[in-house]
Amino acid sequence: MLYDRIIKQGTIDEPDGKPAPDFALPSTVNWMRALRILAEDEGIDFGTATASYGKEGKRKMDVRVENTVLEQLFLGLHHLSALDQFRGGTTAADYARVGVLAWYYGIANAASAMTAAQSGSFQEDHAGTARLWDEQIASRGLAMAPFSWRVSSLVEKIYKVEVDALRNGSAGKLQTRPSTKNDALGAAAGYLSGSAKWYAWKTEEDLKRERAFKELGVDSFRSKAARTLRDQRLERKPMGFVHQAARYRGKANYREALFLAYGSGTETILSGYVEDMHSVLKAFLAMAGAFARRKLGKDLWSEFVADVDAKKAFTTRAGDIWA
């Protein structure tokens, strides 16, 4: 009954019907599994990440910048601790939605810590955080795979070539649960391509509201002038991992009520989902912490880890992630 009402009859905000959750749920779960497989294959932990950042030296920072780095990492650790507790639950659908939110905000906090450590920069909105992390970290080769995956442009003919290179010949599909690295390459490439397509569409919709487009006197991008205007905008827009994470969080927050929570087969599809989110966030936090340690210096870092483990009110230990 509820499916027919929401999906077929619609709601106040979507009178033509909400999008059906059937297609989106497997791809949502499978992307996270693919990330976990690829991160584990890379062997990301604090030790390997610290070695990876061996050429990064301590940076002189204002104390408020140091405090921002530490604050954002602490927030990320708190979100990881929430996911750690969710792993002990018996019904994945009970915490899948809030789990996605904990996962995303943990990623965003860790990303903010990295950009603050790198350049003293900080953004308080989702789009700004994603843009800054891609600009300051990923585009400079300072992220470990699979978090380094990005496209340099939202022009389709450009990003498709870049996605295919990352796919590396894999036949893996986003709709199929990955079990090997080869499967995971294809699934992760599928989500990257889909995200690029979605951000390109969003850019087009935003452009339609701008004066430059309205002055063309058209309502689509079929004309040469409109396509040129669009491509100039798309060409200047890269997209990285935190962009993908922000889109992912949006699905859980805004898609529709049935997503992650309705249907007899949902619990089966969600099997292992929270464990995957926990594993991926743990790897990202380990990477971010290793980067921050190099920039802050070992003395302040050791003091931070010791203080957190002495005074934190939640469960997960900083020393288990960052030592």
What is each stretch, according to the model?
Residues 1-323:
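Terminal alpha-helical segments
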